[in-house]
Amino acid sequence: MTIHSDFRSAAELVSAAHTVSVVGHLRPDADAIGSVTATVEALRQLGKDARGYIGQTDPMPSNLNSIPGSEEIIFTSVLPVSDLIIVVDCGSQERTGEFQESIIGARDRTIVVDHHATNPGFGRVNLISTEAESTTTILLDWFDVLGVQTTRTIAHGLYAGLLTDTGCFRWGRPVMHDMARRLMEHGLDIREISAELIDKTSLEDLQLVGRIMSRIEMHRAGPYRLAVLVADHATINGHSKAAVEGLIEMVRAVDGADFGAVFKEYEPGVFTVSLRSSHLSVGSLAVHLGGGGHVPAAGYTARGTELEALDTLIAAAVELGESLTTTHMANG
């Protein structure tokens, strides 16, 4: 069965539903929020009672508030009962956060839309394309099947996911530019969107980034050179998560590094680890360590001290060795 036939199966589930919950992933990014807002708007256009949800009570990074419709997304630990659940941009059930048990119990009325290679397909219908640059690009094609008219709000959400998940169009298939063109035709101010999602920062955030970046180190991990940055709990507690999450893009660009890693200690002794590389399959490395993601961009959770977490990553890179270079790096 192709994803196009799955589009039709998913459309049938949408047609039969009245109330629909659209769920994005824990610690959402622009692809998650853009996917939720665009899907909610599309469903309402089809006459559905649709709402967007994130399975956490912590707020999202403030720059994501620039995506139209984001103000309506509900951050909560309880997912209301609905006729249909559409899970977007979640590579696993765990990524739905507090909603995990509810999602497990509602498989027969769940549609999964995602582009992560590690997604096992946990819905009744799974619209998964690992070639897709972002979840929003899959939604663009599905909305065509549903007969949804692309509004400026829908276009904004879809473009936000495409822009950020391609690193501002630095990787992806040629078709991504055609998708961007389609979305731009709906009157998007792409300069403003980029400014809000990529460029805008505060003096406090820049000062925080400076303190953390001064600690960057280079380590040997078998045949590879690893740029490492640790954002410890004492330094980042109470500060902007958006600033901390953006650190990996600077670390990945260090000259001479094969891949970059940022260890973010949001809770004492628990590190959210982001991995990036332009030529290695850090997705395989993350899966080996219990996480997931894409070939060039992935992550996992580590526990223990800073030294223990780093030693575990280095040992995994040494164990996997040259296999990390075997995956095709055409897109993210």
Located regions from the model:
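Short alpha-helices
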Residues: 113-181
